[in-house]
Amino acid sequence: RRAAVIILKEFNGLKTPRVQALSRLYSCYSLAMDDIRPPKLEVYRDETVARDYDQRWSGALGKKRDVRKARAILKAFGILKEHHGVSFQNALDIPCGTGRFSDLFDAQGCHTIGADLSVEMLQQARTKHPQQDFLCADMGRLPFEDNAIDVGVCIRMLHLVHSSELRISFLRELNRVCKFGAIIDYRHSHTVRILSRKLRYQLGAYKENPQLPSPRQIQLELQQA
């Protein structure tokens, strides 16, 4: 918990005026900093992992997945804009990682704030996008006032979180700070890919048992948030 505060002080993403206008400053420890934080998320605090992260998406398959995800995000942006009849002034990308989609969000005409708990990933993002704002933040307790953000975007995150309690705490924070809604990458267990992995795990051919929520559980978690 103490380390989380130190990290915030080391990474000066909160010092930009535009972010300060939206933020409230406090110790960022929360449920997300307890022992139930998934070990997979800690991997991204490794400097080597952060430096090499973008290579995962540099091949043909990675680029294809990026294009597919970008289309889904843009479609969701359009639905939210049409539903509320407004143009978004700002967006929160969390966890932003190395800023893979920062340019995509900025192209929507709104100021994008990238947030992540990994300082190492944020350093890569700032190098790639020096004109944009990035800050170190715990998704379980975001340093923003209520409704300070127009729209939030959370991709490649919740499928790594096996605790329903922790997922709900993240969703509640997004609901609190996002005025018009959030775009969530929420993956469920009833897919051919996941069912195949479960079978391979049972046969000893896959090292980890997939622990994704069912579609029904996802609905319940969204309702609780």
Which residues does each predicted region cover?
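Conserved class I S-adenosyl-L-methionine
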Residues: 32-85
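Class I SAM-dependent methyltransferase SAM/SAH-binding core
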Residues: 92, 98-141
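A conserved beta-strand element that flanks and buttresses the S-adenosyl-L-methionine
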Residues: 153
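Short catalytic micro-motifs in class I SAM-dependent methyltransferases
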Residues: 156-160
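A short glycine-rich, Lys/Arg-flanked "PGG" loop and its adjoining helix->strand segment in the class I
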Residues: 168-180
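Conserved beta-strand signature within the Rossmann-like core of class I S-adenosyl-L-methionine
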Residues: 179-187
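Short, glycine-/aromatic-enriched active-site segment of Class I SAM-dependent methyltransferases
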Residues: 187-208
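Short alpha-helix
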Residues: 209-225
